[in-house]
Amino acid sequence: ALLKRAEMPVTLEQLQTERARRGNYYENGADLHPQPGLREFLSALRAQGIRTGVASSTRSQLILTALDRLHLVSQFDVVICGDMVTRRKPDPEPYLRAAQLLGLAPGDCLVIEDSPAGIRAGKAAGCTVLGYTGSSIRQDVSAADLTLSDFHLYRQIPLFQNLSPF
C-alpha cells in the first residue's frame, strides 16, 4: 500500500535498499550538493523578507543532516519532516503545518515540488505549486500550477520577475 500511495513502481526490497542508500548519502555522501541556483534563489527570497520552509516526507534526522551539510539550515524559517506529522504526502498535513508555523494562509504559500505526491499535497493544502523538473530523478509535474527546470531561471516566472538578486 505504501508503494502504491507513493506512486513508485518498485518492490519493497528495492525501496528498503534505496532508503538505506539515501540515508547514507545524506549523512556521508561526498557529492551532496544543492540544486544549481538554489542558494541564489533562497538568498533573493530572504533579501526580500520572504519566509521559507521545508516540508519533506523524509525523517528529520536525514533532512536536518543534509541541510546542515549543505549549509542551508539558516535559509529556512521552518522545517517539517515526515516524523513530525501524523500523515505524510500526498496528504496536505506537512504543508498545512508549515504554513501555520510560518504564520501564513496556505493560499499565500508557494510549494516547490518534484513529485506527483508532493504536488497533490501542496494543491490539497490550497497552495500554489511550482513543479521543479531539474532533479536527477524526473517525475511527472504536469499537475503543478507552474514549472521551473533550473533555479537560475527563477526570474522568468512572473511571480518572481520583480525579485531582486541578492
State where each predicted segment sits.
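Helix-loop "lid/cap" segments that line or gate small-molecule binding pockets
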Residues: A1-P9, A66, A98-A99
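Residue-level marker of regulatory loop/turn positions in helix-turn-helix DNA-binding domains and
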Residues: P34, A55, R87
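Short, flexible loop segments at the rims of nucleotide/cofactor-binding pockets, characterized by
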Residues: N28-H33, S57, A125-G126
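Asp-based, Mg2+/Mn2+-dependent phosphohydrolase catalytic module
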Residues: S43-R46, R59-F166
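Metal-dependent phosphoesterase signature
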Residues: L3-R39, Q48
